[in-house]
């Protein structure tokens, strides 16, 4: 379900503060965040965020195509190890 337009995008308050500090300092360090539910805003373009996936912080460099999406979309939480192969083809 899509969020109502009149509510506006959700962004964690601490995330906005961290982004403002990073922009003001001009440093290009990875900003560690745990808020996967926050929406990516245009003011985040050019910054790199470390989005927590439950084990580690995955670095995500924000570009213009990502605006409007959620941070969690770019930090997968599960690893796919593949399906088991056909046992008959392995034997022969």
Swiss-Prot record:
Keywords, comma-separated and alphabetical: Ribonucleoprotein, Ribosomal protein, RNA-binding, rRNA-binding
GO cellular component: cytoplasm; small ribosomal subunit
Superkingdom, taxonomy of origin: Bacteria
Record GO biological process: ribosomal small subunit assembly; translation
Pfam families per record: Ribosomal_S19
InterPro entries: Ribosomal_uS19, Ribosomal_uS19_bac-type, Ribosomal_uS19_CS, Ribosomal_uS19_SF
Disulfide bonds: none
GO molecular function, one term: rRNA binding
Function comment: Protein S19 forms a complex with S13 that binds strongly to the 16S ribosomal RNA.
Family under the similarity heading: Belongs to the universal ribosomal protein uS19 family.
Protein's UniProt name: Small ribosomal subunit protein uS19
Native source species: Rhodopseudomonas palustris (strain BisB5)
